């Protein structure tokens, strides 16, 4: 029975991911017209932000299932496969739907945007496909204990999940809402994020072998950046920390081992 405890956490992760999918699918875009012209004022539906909250909650539970598995010495092959299946939904499908909705909003801002073909929105799901490929490769590779090959899907999922929260709450330093509702920026995010997941770039895992500065300098720098960014930038801290993670991993390049 003890060995099933981590699997319960994994299923909670999946459950939260499913709820995120439901909220992301229920969003409605409200467009405001001034006369006959579509105004630049529009809102990011509250339910899209709720989807983001559930993705972040799923990430917390995803961390806990691994922690509990190690604590109870209850790791199993079934748990490994179940974890990947859950992650595809929580950090692949749900964030892809968020991208789909943001693309829809970006087109609605344009003249004749309501006539946009769904084909322009479907590239959002390339992220889910890339994430599934990334997880399948990870399950077959035993060399990624203290380093990753390619960006882990939870990191990519949280990066995307931060977008609605940034748009809804903003920050006092910089307004990035025009970028996050620009179709070309979103397409670039889809391409770059998908490539980062399926690539074999050596990226650091956030595990501490010990607490020496020599062996953990990039991780300690990342922690400092994360704390400062969270204090100063609120939800914009998420993409900032994500980018810092990539840069630090490449600067302190280390092969997964």
Regions from the PLM with identified roles:
Residues 1-63, 241, 252:
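Topogenic membrane-insertion module of multi-pass membrane proteins
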Residues 18-26, 92-102, 159-167:
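Membrane-interfacial alpha-helical segments at the cytosolic side of multi-pass membrane proteins
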Residues 1-14, 48, 69-88, 135-155, ...:
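Interhelical loop and helix-boundary elements at the membrane-water interface
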Residues 18-21, 57, 61, 95, ...:
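Alpha-helical transmembrane segments of polytopic integral membrane proteins
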Residues 42-46, 53, 71-135:
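Multi-pass membrane catalytic core of lipid/isoprenoid biosynthesis enzymes
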Residues 9-12, 51-55, 123-130, 156, ...:
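Hydrophobic alpha-helical transmembrane segments of polytopic
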Residues 145-257:
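C-terminal membrane-associated helical module and adjoining short loops/tails
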Residues 36-47, 111-120, 148, 175-185:
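Interfacial loop-to-helix junctions that mark the boundaries of transmembrane helices
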């Amino acid at each position: 029975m003890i060995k099933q405890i981590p699997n319960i956490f994994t299923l909670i992760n999946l459950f939260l991911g499913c709820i995120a999918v439901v909220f992301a699918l229920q969003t409605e875009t409200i467009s405001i017209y001034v006369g006959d012209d579509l105004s630049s004022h529009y809102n990011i539906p509250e339910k899209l932000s709720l989807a983001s909250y559930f993705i972040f909650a799923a990430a917390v539970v995803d961390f806990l299932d691994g922690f509990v598995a190690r604590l109870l010495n209850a790791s199993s092959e079934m748990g490994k496969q179940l974890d990947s299946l859950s992650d595809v939904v929580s950090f692949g499908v749900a964030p892809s739907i968020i991208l789909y909705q943001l693309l829809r909003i970006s087109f609605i801002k344009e003249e004749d945007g309501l006539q946009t073909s769904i084909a322009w929105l479907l590239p959002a799901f390339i992220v889910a496909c890339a994430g599934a490929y990334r997880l399948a490769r990870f399950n077959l590779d035993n060399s990624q204990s203290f380093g990753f090959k390619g960006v882990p899907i939870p990191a990519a999922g949280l990066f995307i999940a931060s977008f609605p929260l940034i748009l809804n709450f903003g920050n006092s330093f910089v307004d990035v809402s025009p970028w996050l509702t620009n179709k070309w920026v979103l397409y670039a995010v889809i391409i770059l994020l998908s490539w980062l997941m399926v690539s074999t770039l050596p990226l650091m895992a956030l595990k501490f072998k010990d607490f020496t500065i020599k062996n953990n300098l990039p991780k300690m720098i990342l922690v400092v950046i994360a704390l400062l960014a969270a204090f100063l930038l609120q939800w914009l801290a998420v993409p900032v920390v994500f980018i810092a993670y990539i840069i630090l991993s490449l600067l302190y390049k280390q092969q997964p081992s």
